[in-house]
Design a protein with these regions (language model features):
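Acidic/polar, glycine-enriched structural segments that form the non-catalytic walls/loops
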Residues: 1-38, 139-141, 151-159, 213-214, ...
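Aromatic-rich carbohydrate-recognition surfaces in CAZymes
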Residues: 39-170, 196-199, 203, 280, ...
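Short, conserved charged micro-motifs
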Residues: 297
Length: 418
């Protein structure tokens, strides 16, 4: 058995605690992250839960549990589609109505209806649908009505978050962006940051969307999504890969020639973006998405070995240690992505390294992750949301499960490729 017995046994004992029944205005069963997030449906959190639990459900050889996981995985998607608004908007999170009994629908939807522009469901909706469908060998649970909802979802992204001039997607603001306080977006002007996190995962979302529409008999729309993906990849290479530092950065797209009276009548701003040269773990995501060139991937591998920036015995610091914003203190709302170890970041960089044949680096990330969680479980009796990159000590939010299960994926994927 390639799994850590300590981690596997803990997850087996606690797995069902995150499989939630319908509650409040949430009509379908769903998976929550555990800990303080109990009873709410989250966008990318549910994706990574399903990503980890589906292969594990096969390994456990418990048919009833596997069927239950699949039911809850589908429920994640159905709940999100249930609260899609007429313009295609889908919220990032659906809170349990018991959180605020005055609400008749998700808070984010209420804000959107009131004309407040908000970020929307991160680009993991089609990825989760494709993940489930490929696992069970069936896409037909997504019917014609749901396909139209997916088209409206992509339309909403294009209309509200796509900057055609630069060919990249932007966060509207810094609310619920996944990496809560990523300094490339946190505290910056609205609609100004084309975040490498958002754009890397969007290439994967467009690919998954194309797979869904192909499987369900709409090759024309699938082709449109594939073409958009290729254009986006070109823009990421052109705008986000820094030829000086050999690293992928988020970029500032709020760059224009601002004329005033008779000033600035000559050569204007001809560049489309400015690099936000902050070394964040998300700079490695083009390797996860499979869009980095071999040369870019080799440069990223070298960055991973930069001890002053990303060195840790427990994985990858979410922000380079030599950035002035580096901070590992406990904070909630926003959670802290300014350097602590997060298992989802460890997995994404692990998988990217494995994609490009860098097995040694993948093994080191896996070993650090196993070391981290085994020690936490033995010492505290549970897993936490994020960790100190120097000591491996948990920072906060005990009882967190969610993407920490990805450590088992790491072990299995290394074993599968031997």
């Amino acid at each position: 058995m390639y799994y850590s017995k300590i981690i596997l046994n803990y997850i087996k004992e606690n797995l069902t605690t995150v499989l939630k029944p319908p509650v409040g205005f949430i009509r379908y069963p769903f998976i929550d992250p555990g800990s303080v997030y109990d009873g709410n449906v989250w966008d990318w959190d549910t994706y990574w839960s399903v990503y980890a639990l589906l292969p594990l459900s096969k390994e456990l050889k418990d048919k009833a549990l596997r069927e239950r996981i699949i039911e809850h995985a589908k429920g994640n998607v159905l709940n999100m589609l249930d609260f899609q608004l007429s313009d295609g908007y889908i919220p990032m999170m659906i809170e349990n109505k018991l959180f605020d009994k005055r609400l008749s629908e998700p808070y984010l939807n209420i804000q959107h209806k009131n004309g407040v522009t908000m970020n929307m469901h991160k680009p993991f909706l089609c990825q989760q649908i494709a993940l489930i469908s490929k696992d069970i060998g069936d896409y037909t649970w997504i019917d014609e009505i749901k396909l139209e909802k997916l088209k409206k979802y992509f339309f909403c992204y294009e209309k509200n978050y796509y900057k055609e001039r630069v060919g990249l997607y932007v966060w509207h603001d810094d609310i619920m962006i996944g990496m809560d306080n990523d300094p490339a977006s946190f505290g910056r002007p609205k609609d100004s940051t084309a975040n490498i996190f958002l754009n890397s995962f969007m290439t994967m979302e467009l690919q998954s969307g194309a797979e869904i529409f192909t499987a369900l008999g709409d090759p024309g729309y699938a082709r449109q999504l594939s073409e958009k993906r290729l254009r986006l990849i070109d823009a990421i290479h052109e705008e986000c890969f820094d030829r000086r530092d050999k690293f992928f950065y988020s970029v500032d797209v709020d760059v224009y020639t601002r004329k005033y009276d008779w000033f600035h009548q000559g050569l204007g701003v001809f560049w489309k973006s400015l690099p936000i040269r902050i070394a964040v773990w998300s700079g490695f995501l083009p390797m996860l998405a499979g869009i980095a060139t071999k040369e870019e991937a080799e440069a990223l591998r070298e960055h991973l070995h930069d001890e002053e920036a990303f060195g840790s015995d427990y994985g990858i610091p979410t922000l380079a240690k030599n950035e002035k914003m580096f901070n590992i203190e406990a904070t909630n709302n926003p959670s802290n992505w300014l350097g602590p170890i997060w298992l989802v970041a460890n997995y994404c960089v692990f998988k990217g390294m494995l994609n490009y044949g860098y097995r040694k680096e993948a093994e080191e990330l896996c070993a650090g992750s196993v070391r981290l969680l085994e020690r936490d479980i033995e010492k505290t009796g549970c897993m936490h949301e994020y960790y100190n990159p120097f000591t491996g000590e948990p920072v906060m939010k005990g009882g967190f499960i969610n993407w920490n299960v990805l450590v088992l994926n790491m072990q299995k994927e290394l074993d599968d490729r031997e």
